[in-house]
Swiss-Prot record:
GO molecular function: RNA binding; structural constituent of virion
Phylogenetic classification of the source organism: Viruses, Riboviria, Orthornavirae, Negarnaviricota, Polyploviricotina
RNA-binding in keyword set: yes
Organism, scientific name: Influenza A virus (strain A/Chicken/Hong Kong/YU562/2001 H5N1 genotype B)
Keyword tags: Host nucleus, Membrane, RNA-binding, Viral matrix protein, Virion
Oligomeric and partner information: Homodimer and homomultimer. Interacts with NEP. Binds ribonucleocapsid by both interacting with genomic RNA and NP protein. May interact with HA and NA. Cannot bind NP without genomic RNA.
Gene field: M
The protein's name: Matrix protein 1
Residue numbers covered by motif Nuclear localization signal: 101-105
Record region (RNP-binding): 165-252
InterPro entries (UniProt xref): Flu_matrix_M1, Flu_matrix_M1_C, Flu_matrix_M1_N, Flu_matrix_M1_N_sub1, Flu_matrix_M1_N_sub2, INFV_M1
Entry membrane topology: Peripheral membrane protein
Pfam families in the record: Flu_M1 (PF00598), Flu_M1_C (PF08289)
Amino acid sequence: MSLLTEVETYVLSIIPSGPLKAEIAQRLEDVFAGKNTDLEALMEWLKTRPILSPLTKGILGFVFTLTVPSERGLQRRRFVQNALNGNGDPNNMDRAVKLYKKLKREITFHGAKEVALSYSTGALASCMGLIYNRMGTVTTEVAFGLLCATCEQIADSQHRSHRQMATTTNPLIRHENRMVLASTTAKAMEQVAGSSEQAAEAMEVANQARQMVQAMRTIGTHPNSSAGLRDNLLENLQAYQKRMGVQMQRFK
């Protein structure tokens, strides 16, 4: 796996699924392929994206700044600086300085990543801030190692949170989660269906599912009533794809 492929993988792992994730993936591909060379426009685009947390925007801004060639005097962006200041905690800054001194001795991506993984997310973000603000310089490979260690820590905590929700025994949370998943699956079905005549059936199924979820939320239903809703949708989608001659893995 090439270095840039690895970086792209780690960065995308912390971005929530949806159309915005697909858009960000495309921008990263373009940047890594040298197709997008306007850093100013890229940062302006990133700043105005909805949904993303300030830290995620800071991480993406760090990647773009490392990768896109730019004028030496180009101003650093405030939204990235604020995101990479370790919440203003002096302890994070102290640890970031210690980490930076260790990273100066590293020359490889994997070496830097290993060193960085033993620090907290706040310290890692602060260390990225030091490099972003030109207070310290390391090789691009080492900076990418630091970045990927940060993404790995964030992805780990997101995974723990998702797992807790998936295994919760609270019937109300499970019920709502099934309905949310059914809605997003319906949306995916509509995108897969496209605009062909044969797509009408898949669109109809997706539309009915969304109406059902809306009705369930409006009138309030028994927590077990949503069981199997998403699986039924997926079966319908697979049946439609088979008829269209498309074989696709489940959205699971």
